[in-house]
């Protein structure tokens, strides 16, 4: 007797620090009083099966989310941070939530694979000389986003990439075949400084699809005073940001620095929420699936390689 029943709502209140951390990862901010009000009094009136004590059922959460994100007067923009955080908790539950989440259904058993007959291919022949495998060069690390408090923002549109040195003519003598047969392990590995200089000096090949990224140089917090406010004139600032994205192909870190420099915290949060709402699924229409939204518009730094064309 005297034992209290643990509910999803009470569980989130007991781990409120983790809830705020998850909300911060979604670039939103939540308050405890409004968290309780929306869960116990507002969302049960949507008639989608939301209980007053809350739930971690992802299907019900997505139905509430569709009501919150409804366009026009039927939407609830003030509830967006809270339902997005509920969705993140249910989609990737922390340890204290996993006991309350329904286990995923195991895949149906498949028919056993029959062993194939004896192979009719001839046995492989051993080579007289060992095969030479080319050495795999390490993937270049992501450049650090640097800032120059003294430079104006117009440098982003007029700055040219650093010049490249001319590439020396290739040797055309008859020793090419013997050089290719030489083991690559005999060539000493260049030092990190030499590799960095060489990567900036050697131009890419004619048929190469590798992209090269250069860090943006922003002018610090003074750029908010030198450019129009996004709330007052969103069209002019949007055109400026689009021109930077087109001419410089910035990385994920560059985009975060660009938004943080030109927008206020509230404006940046509104832009991120609208961008995630505009993500389209395979059918070409806006999607609400968390995995598709996070894959197309990640809020945390993704493991992307900026040297590839995609």
UniProtKB/Swiss-Prot annotation:
Motif PTAP/PSAP motif: where in chain: 109-112
InterPro entries found in the cross-reference section: G_retro_matrix, G_retro_matrix_sf, Gag_p12, Gag_P30, Retrov_capsid_N, Retroviral_Gag-Pol_poly, Retrovr_matrix
Signal peptide: none
Short motif (LYPX(n)L motif): ranges: 128-132
Any single GO BP term: viral budding via host ESCRT complex
Gene3D superfamilies reported in the protein's UniProt record: Gamma-retroviral matrix domain, Human Immunodeficiency Virus Type 1 Capsid Protein
Record-level GO cellular component terms: host cell plasma membrane; membrane; viral capsid
Other notes: This protein is synthesized as a Gag-Fos-Fox polyprotein.
Protein name: Gag polyprotein
């Amino acid at each position: 007797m005297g034992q209290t029943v643990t509910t999803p709502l009470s569980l989130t209140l007991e781990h409120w620090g983790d809830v705020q951390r998850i909300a911060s990862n979604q670039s939103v901010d939540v308050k405890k009083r409004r968290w309780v009000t929306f869960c116990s009094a507002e969302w049960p009136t949507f008639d989608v099966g939301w209980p007053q004590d809350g739930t971690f059922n992802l299907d019900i959460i997505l139905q509430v989310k569709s009501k919150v994100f409804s366009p026009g007067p039927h939407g609830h923009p003030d509830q967006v941070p809270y339902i997005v955080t509920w969705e993140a908790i249910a989609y990737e539950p922390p340890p204290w939530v996993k006991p309350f989440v329904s286990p995923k259904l195991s895949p149906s058993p498949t028919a056993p694979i029959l062993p194939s007959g004896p192979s009719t291919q001839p046995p492989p022949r051993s080579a007289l000389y060992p095969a030479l495998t080319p050495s795999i060069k390490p993937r270049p690390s992501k450049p650090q986003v640097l800032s120059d408090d003294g430079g104006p923002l117009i440098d982003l549109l007029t700055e040219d990439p650093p010049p490249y040195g001319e590439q020396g003519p290739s040797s055309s003598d008859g020793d090419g075949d013997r050089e290719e047969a030489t083991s690559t392990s005999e060539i000493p590995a260049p030092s990190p400084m030499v590799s960095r200089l060489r990567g900036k000096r050697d131009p890419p090949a004619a048929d190469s699809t590798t992209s090269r990224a250069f860090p943006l140089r922003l002018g610090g917090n003074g750029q908010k005073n030198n450019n129009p406010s996004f709330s007052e004139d969103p069209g002019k600032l949007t055109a400026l940001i689009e021109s930077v994205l087109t001419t410089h192909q910035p990385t994920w870190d560059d985009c975060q620095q660009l938004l943080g420099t030109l927008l206020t915290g509230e404006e940046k949060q509104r832009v991120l929420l609208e961008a995630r709402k505009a993500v389209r699924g395979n059918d070409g229409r806006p999607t609400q699936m968390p995995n598709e939204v996070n894959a197309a518009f990640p809020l945390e730094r993704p493991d992307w390689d900026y040297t590839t064309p995609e």
